[in-house]
Amino acid sequence: MTSLCLTIAPAVLSLICLSSYGWAEDNNGIHTLDDGDNDPFFRHNRQFYRFGRAFVPLWDNADDSLVRKNLLTHWSEFPLSPALSSSDVFSRNSRQFYRFGRSYPPYQDKRFLRFGRSHQPDIDEYLQALNSDQALYRKRRSEDGDSKEDGLNRVARSADANQQSKNTQSNKFGKDLQKRETKKEKLNANDDLEILSNEDDLEKKFMRFGKRFMRFGRGDEDESYDKRFMRFGKSLRHDQEFEKRFMRFGKRFMRFGRGDEDDAREEKRFLRFGKSSNEDEDIKKRFMRFGKSGNEDGDVDKRFMRFGKRFMRFGKSEKEDGDVDKRFMRFGKRFMRFGRGDSETS
């Protein structure tokens, strides 16, 4: 217990000494300002943080909450606001504000939250305004003092000035910058996207991504020129290679339509739903068919969807044979019969 007390006592004494030292430093700063420091603001340190507008004696603000009357000093270089007395100067606590950067003029940049150094080319105007005895706030112009005749004269002077400025610009820049009206015939001719004679102008009609671009339209150029585009449409050149009319992804492509070529090997690449134009039974067996075959032969069962050698048959066979049970759906050797045969079995 004794060792614990001996440890706590020096720590408490150290805290008391530090707080006393800080209080003494604050008082020294206040006395330094009272002795004649040329700083209109009370600050513990110039590296303070500030958000908001700085309250300086250059602007009119009669807010008594910001006036620290117990810490007033006189700074003769800045003119005081008429709303306050000649002995009022403002003090400011550094903890109320947050500032990032260095302040260049102490009366303008402190209104803003700044990141960096201020650069103001019109600093001479502010210095001239500070050194003058005129009021730094703008007075509202009274409308009662203006007569009707003064208003008419002012409007006439402004109209003459505008006309003179237009004439000066016209003489200076010439006729190139004057407003020119577009004829109606030109507007109507440019509405439709007609193919121009120049090949360079033809490419300007489309949306381009570098040298290769997507084209949504038709062109009269050769077929090798069309292969660079993703095309949604029909080429004007009707050649025998009809596959190039459609959207292509490499050598194999999806075709939505019917070709005029009766080539069986070409049809093998497609998933076909419908009739085949070629009357070849071997070609029909390659597809999953939902329809009727064009070839009316005796084997009517091939009209249906087949799964291997066994198939589901939904219909009636045209061949009336003794084996009536084959007309129905069969599952293995035993089958389910939905109907009645023509021959009465015992």
Curated annotation (Swiss-Prot):
Tissue expression pattern: Central nervous system.
Q: Annotated region Disordered: where?
A: 137-185
Superkingdom of the source species? Eukaryota
In which residue ranges is the amino acid composition biased (Polar residues)?
A: 160-172
Q: What residue ranges constitute the propeptide?
A: 20-45, 54-94, 103-109, 118-203, 219-226, 235-243, 259-267, 276-283, 293-301, 317-325, 341-346
Basic and acidic residues bias spans: 141-152, 173-185
One GO cellular-component annotation of the UniProt record comes to: extracellular region
- Which protein is depicted? FMRFamide-related peptides type HF-1
Q: Which organism is it from?
A: Cornu aspersum (Brown garden snail)
